């Protein structure tokens, strides 16, 4: 591979915050708050996670990866930041979660090693942090078994998403550190659907993830104007 599909500035952002990953009152609070929603959504659409081989791409400190392991999945979490991975390993050890492993490896490289090895692949809150999202989608398609499920989440690119995800979340509500997101890396649902089709995946569902700053409640609904999640399957035998 001539060039890694990695933005070193993006990696550095999350490396610097690694020690706070499991602090539910830190900058990662939103990830902890949305995790039950996304975990249940994935679990239901995958027909249950228990007993399945699962890959979490861009796993960070392991909030989603460890929760899927707790549901009975055999989980591999991969990321390009070593500090978050170290935090994930330590937390799993402290919590005695044994059916989880972490590796520092690009997903494209793992796809060359382990094509068609996973029942479920997840890539959540990561696509908007890489230079080439289409390459990530293709690698995920390669890694999942025929009939398996691939899940993505990202942020739409439009004036509303700029207002909510950057101005609102980073500057007004201060839910996230300033500079967490780059508007130009946000991905329209049409662009995501295009990459999914080109990779050979079948789009099953898109749903929006919504937040009320007054009630501090998250919920899922069809509107995908800002944050959204995607369920795809790999057809064929």
Swiss-Prot record:
Which Gene3D superfamilies does this one have?
Answer: Vaccinia Virus protein VP39
Q: Which domain of life is it from?
A: Bacteria
Give the pathway annotation.
Answer: Cofactor biosynthesis; ubiquinone biosynthesis
Q: Which GO terms describe its molecular function?
A: 2-polyprenyl-6-hydroxyphenol methylase activity; 3-demethylubiquinol 3-O-methyltransferase activity; polyprenyldihydroxybenzoate methyltransferase activity
Q: Name one Pfam family in it.
A: Methyltransf_23
- Organism of this sequence: Acinetobacter baumannii (strain SDF)
Recorded protein name is Ubiquinone biosynthesis O-methyltransferase
Q: Which InterPro entries match?
A: SAM-dependent_MTases_sf (IPR029063), UbiG_MeTrfase (IPR010233)
Binding site residues for S-adenosyl-L-methionine:
38, 58, 79, 124
Chain's role: O-methyltransferase that catalyzes the 2 O-methylation steps in the ubiquinone biosynthetic pathway.
Q: Which reaction does this chain catalyze?
A: a 3-demethylubiquinol + S-adenosyl-L-methionine = a ubiquinol + S-adenosyl-L-homocysteine + H(+); a 3-(all-trans-polyprenyl)benzene-1,2-diol + S-adenosyl-L-methionine = a 2-methoxy-6-(all-trans-polyprenyl)phenol + S-adenosyl-L-homocysteine + H(+)
Quote the EC number: 2.1.1.222, 2.1.1.64
Q: What class of enzyme is it?
A: transferase
A single GO BP term for this record reads:
methylation
Q: Which CDD domains match?
A: AdoMet_MTases
């Amino acid at each position: 591979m001539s060039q890694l599909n990695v933005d070193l500035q993006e990696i550095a952002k999350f490396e610097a915050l690694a020690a706070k990953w499991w602090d539910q009152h830190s900058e990662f609070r939103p990830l902890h708050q949305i995790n039950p929603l996304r975990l249940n959504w994935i679990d239901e659409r995958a027909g249950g996670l228990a007993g399945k081989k699962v890959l979490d791409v861009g796993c960070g400190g392991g909030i989603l990866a460890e929760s899927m392991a707790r549901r009975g999945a055999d989980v591999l979490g991969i990321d390009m930041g070593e500090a978050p991975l170290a935090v994930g390993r330590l937390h799993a050890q402290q919590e005695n979660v044994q059916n989880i492993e972490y590796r520092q490896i690009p997903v494209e490289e793992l796809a060359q090693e382990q094509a068609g090895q996973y029942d479920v692949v997840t890539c959540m809150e990561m696509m908007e942090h890489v230079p080439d999202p289409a390459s990530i989608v293709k690698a995920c398609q390669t890694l999942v078994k025929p009939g398996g499920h691939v899940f993505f989440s990202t942020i739409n690119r439009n004036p509303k998403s700029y207002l909510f995800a950057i101005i609102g979340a980073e500057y007004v509500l201060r839910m996230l550190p300033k500079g967490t997101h780059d508007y130009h890396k946000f991905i329209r649902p049409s662009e995501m659907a295009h990459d999914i089709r080109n990779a050979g995946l079948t789009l099953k569902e898109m749903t929006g993830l919504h937040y009320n700053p007054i009630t501090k409640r998250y919920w899922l609904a069809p509107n995908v104007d800002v944050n959204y999640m995607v369920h795809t399957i790999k057809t064929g035998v």
